[in-house]
Amino acid sequence: HEAVPQKFDELAHAAGRDPLQFRLDLLGQQDTVPPSDGRGAPYHVGRMRAVLQEAAKRAGWGTPLPKGRGRGIAFQFSHRGYVAQVAEVTVSREGELKVDRVTVVTDIGGQIVNLSGAENQVQGSVIDALGTLMHAQLDIEGGRIVQSNFGEYPLIRLAESPPRIDVHFMKTD
């Protein structure tokens, strides 16, 4: 599923559109959408739109960046929570990527009992996702996966982690 946000960006750029506005337009104007299977809770498009807009605002979306720097935006609906992330990155002359900052805005509804724990959970999720993005690779030889355990599966290192992961929780019911 990590490929989906990239496809949104590719489609937006091919259409000459801003990736944020492209996503907002795709969400449409409805406030809720019923579940596709007829069961479960409806999808609250308004809440998704709100986290996207808030993440963009807090990350300075649309403000100029120096040469070699850029921003990307993505959103996710998971476990009845609405999450938007903006990553600010630098690409060196050698083509090496460094994630400078990630801004996350989430609407999980309800009261957060342990704010520090919730922030740490989101920050850990960002680190895990970046590790998957930067290092995840399974090699297959002779029809079998070469890596036999996590010891052979590289994880992100502290030096590769962004120095800033800003987490913001929207107050909703």
Where are these predicted regions, by residue range?
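Short beta-strand scaffold segments in enzyme catalytic cores
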Residues: 85-89
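C-terminal catalytic domains of large/alpha subunits in multi-subunit enzymes
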Residues: 2-80, 90-173
